[in-house]
Amino acid sequence: IVAPNKLHYVYMEEWSQAYPTAKVWATKGLEKIFADSKVISSYTILDKTVTMSWQSEIDYLPFEGSAFIEESVFFHKKSRTLILTDLIENIELLEECSCWHRFLFKIGDNTYPNGHTPRDLRMTFLFNKEIARKCYQKIKSWEPVNVLFAHGNCFIGDAEEKLPQAFFWLE
């Protein structure tokens, strides 16, 4: 069970209860929250030094450089699929979306079909952009074909074209 960043951990206790023998992994920044948990008694903080049982199938990288958040990035080697959480959003503005939501997504610069790292998240890398650029170069070196992420339409089969567009701010 993986908490990929400090914004995506809310149901970790429920998943831990449902699967009590599962190993729990958490990204840096969740130590205090997990230490206060009455359910999650054992967990491992993901960092560059930790050994994971899935290493032969999945590569791991902590995407660093943000003043606010560190995100765990994964790459499934066999399918050449990059797995992100919030580093790219590609929100489709459906007719049901209110004008207010449309406005927020537009200024967030994270709408379909041109998904990007959201503008507010990009700003958190302002003072450590070189660190983020090194992380981006690493994920590009994996040569993903697909990119999965938590918010919006994923990039299936066209990662080579879409990834540089999404990370234009690090190109």
Task: List where the protein language model places each region.
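Short, flexible loop segments at the rims of nucleotide/cofactor-binding pockets, characterized by
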Residues: I1-P4, I58-E64, M123-N128
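Active-site HxH/HxHxD metal-binding segment of metal-dependent hydrolases
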Residues: I1-S53
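Active-site metal-binding loops of divalent metal-dependent hydrolases
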Residues: K6, G29-L30, T85-L87, G152-N153
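Cap/insert and terminal regions of metallo-dependent hydrolase folds
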Residues: Y11-E14, A18, L93-E171
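Short glycine/proline-enriched coil/turn segments at helix->beta-strand junctions
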Residues: Y19-T21, K77-S79, P144
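Catalytic core of the metallo-beta-lactamase
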Residues: V39-I107, K134-S141
